């Protein structure tokens, strides 16, 4: 082929290589997370402060609040699978968006700040094991553009095991849902926060075997609340985070999934246990962010084939 031919071939092959992955997706779940600026009504809860839960978002359909959501990275957020169960065509996510960095679930139509922190959803992924009932109630949403981090918008941490959080009494759940079973969150629809205790699954199963309503607590669930009731997630909080602090960083250990009423005694809220889905989350985020072959690379070889006969030895 000669030196000129070899040089041309090398240039074409270099151009035909794999495209670089998007920088925000190259290392999922590995960047800084779980930090917040503010350190200081879900049922029995109180108004939150802006920046206290910077990973909290509002999953919206045609700009109406549907569920809570938590930010994991620049392009990924976590919610509950049942938030989408009445919407059959998830291959078309048009109309779905996520709002971050706002205390209210109903920001003003004229708010530029809300407009610039609203991100359309490009893909929706339900757990492949979700069958429309309680177990495996978890979903990932991929955003169409990278989220800009600010002091009011930050990702939360995840980890493969949540065993160390069992029996903690100082975890928190946040959301814009009902403040009582029969009372919606009033205007100005401010994000609510409430402190809850983690209840081990053996005790939780025992509680749900009592009385007339029986419900099984599966291995991928975690319960939180208190024996007296009054502190719980409620309708509209679904998909939001159950978070605990560890060494100054916040970790999401659960996703709001279901409950019997809201804040009833001996009826804790039930959450999807993140640790049972950590590998699925990690793999999906990594696979979706992998390099893809440039679809134009085969076309680059046609000029090469045409030029080779013309390239003699130097």
Swiss-Prot record:
GO annotation, cellular component aspect: cytoplasm; extracellular region; extracellular space; membrane; plasma membrane; side of membrane
Q: Glycosylated where?
A: 167, 200, 273
Report where it is expressed, by tissue. Expressed predominantly in premeiotic testicular germ cells, mostly late pachytene and diplotene spermatocytes.
Annotated membrane topology: Lipid-anchor; GPI-anchor
Disulfide cysteine pairs (residue numbers): 33-157, 67-83, 171-244, 204-223, 234-262
The record's subcellular location field reads: Cell membrane
- Name recorded for this polypeptide: Testisin
């Amino acid at each position: 082929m000669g030196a000129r031919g070899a040089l041309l071939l090398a240039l074409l092959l270099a151009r035909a290589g794999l495209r670089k992955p998007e920088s925000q997706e190259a290392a999922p779940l590995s960047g800084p997370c779980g930090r917040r600026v503010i350190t200081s009504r879900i049922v029995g809860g109180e108004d939150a402060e802006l920046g206290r839960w910077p990973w909290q978002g509002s999953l919206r359909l045609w700009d109406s609040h549907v569920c809570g959501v938590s930010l994991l990275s620049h392009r990924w957020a976590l919610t509950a699978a049942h938030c989408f169960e009445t919407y059959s065509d998830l291959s078309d996510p048009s109309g779905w968006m996520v709002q971050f960095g706002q205390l209210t679930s109903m920001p003003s139509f004229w708010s530029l700040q809300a407009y610039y922190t609203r991100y359309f959803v490009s893909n929706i992924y339900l757990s492949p094991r979700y069958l429309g009932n309680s177990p495996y109630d978890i979903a990932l949403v991929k955003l169409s553009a990278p989220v800009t981090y600010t002091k009011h918008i930050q990702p939360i941490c995840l980890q493969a095991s949540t065993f160390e959080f069992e029996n903690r009494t100082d975890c928190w759940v946040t959301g814009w849902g009902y403040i009582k079973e029969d009372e919606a969150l009033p205007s100005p629809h401010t994000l609510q926060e409430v402190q809850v205790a983690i209840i081990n699954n053996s005790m939780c199963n025992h509680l749900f075997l009592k009385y007339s309503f029986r419900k099984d607590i599966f291995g991928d669930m975690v319960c939180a609340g208190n024996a007296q009731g009054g502190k719980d997630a409620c309708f509209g909080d679904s998909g939001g985070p159950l978070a605990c602090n560890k060494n100054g960083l916040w970790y999401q250990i659960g996703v709001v999934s279901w409950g019997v009423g809201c804040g009833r005694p001996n009826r804790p809220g039930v959450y999807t246990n993140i640790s049972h889905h950590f590998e699925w989350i990690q793999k999906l985020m990594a696979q979706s962010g992998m390099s893809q072959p440039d679809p134009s690379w085969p076309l680059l070889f046609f000029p090469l084939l045409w030029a080779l006969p013309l390239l003699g030895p130097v």
